[in-house]
Design a protein with these regions (language model features):
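A generic "folded-domain core" signal
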Residues: 23-185
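C-terminal segment of classical bacterial N-terminal signal peptides
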Residues: 14-23
Length: 185
């Protein structure tokens, strides 16, 4: 019994000393300098927000335009539609992420309205606990041209976990200006 208590005491002392050494090393390390350029920026264009984030070393920026969706009476968004480039030379992609309440196999459709015969189909890529389920697709130039000409609401459709179709309206208001801002970023 005494050996067990001694072993526990030695283990506790080791943990304290190890933690103190790590804390001292962290305390002595200088934080990186702060850039004169902002690390993150955002600009609103109607119902769309252009978000840009600078890399840690300041050598590049990643930007996307976003529209979030919130259920009345609930805190925080339940879904998000984002448009951006994965890499600087890559084509524009639309990404939809939503809380995990979906059916497989299924797709997400982005349409001008309920009569649109050429909706953009986004393929589910992954579901991440605590983050949501993600679907995406490349946006072709003809689709962007049609979307820029719209003034009302589009329609996002998907299947929920019970297999029922769910429709969520999204806004085209400010999309042309947001896409122009994205192109300049």
């Amino acid at each position: 019994m005494k050996m067990r208590i001694a072993a526990l005491a030695i283990g506790a002392l080791f943990a304290v000393l190890t933690g103190a050494t790590a804390w001292a090393a962290d305390k002595d390390a200088a934080p990186p300098p702060v850039s004169t350029d902002p690390q993150t920026t955002s600009a609103s264009y109607g119902d769309w927000i252009l978000n840009c984030v600078r890399s840690q070393d300041g050598s590049s920026r990643v930007c996307e335009i976003v529209q979030t969706f919130q259920i009345q009476g609930q805190q925080g968004p339940f879904a998000r539609l984002a448009i951006g480039h994965v890499g600087a030379k890559d084509p524009l992609r639309a990404t939809f992420d939503v809380a995990p309440n979906i059916s497989f196999p299924s797709t997400v459709k982005l349409a001008l309205d309920d009569k649109d015969t050429q909706p953009v189909e986004l393929t589910w890529k992954k579901c991440v606990p605590g983050a949501g389920c993600f679907a995406d697709a490349e946006l072709k130039e003809d689709v962007l041209k049609r979307w820029k000409a719209q003034t009302g609401n589009g329609r996002i459709t998907m299947k929920d976990s019970t297999g029922h179709d769910v429709a969520v309206p999204f806004s085209f208001r400010g999309l042309p200006q947001a896409l122009d801002g994205l192109a300049k970023s």
